[in-house]
């Protein structure tokens, strides 16, 4: 698992509408908004600029995804 920020290409969209899992091989499992605690991610969760996200997947995939932020 890797903690990173939401990449610009995914902000303003629901997780279900992004291609994060398909294109990058990672799953967003939790989201933390500034001033709030972590919450579980769902398909209808909208990512916002500045969100911290936890992603899971293969080490190589999670590290590559983190570099997009």
Where are these regions (language model features)?
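Short glycine-/aliphatic-rich beta-strand segments at the starts of folded cytosolic domains
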Residues: 1-5
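Cytosolic Rossmann-like ligand/nucleotide-binding regulatory domains
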Residues: 6-69
């Amino acid at each position: 698992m890797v903690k990173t920020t939401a990449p610009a290409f995914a902000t303003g969209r629901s997780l279900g509408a992004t291609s994060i899992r398909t294109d990058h091989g990672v799953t967003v499992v939790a989201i933390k908004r500034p001033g709030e605690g972590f919450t579980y991610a769902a398909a209808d969760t909208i990512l916002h600029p500045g969100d911290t996200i936890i992603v899971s997947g293969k080490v190589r995939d999670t590290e590559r995804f983190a570099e997009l932020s």
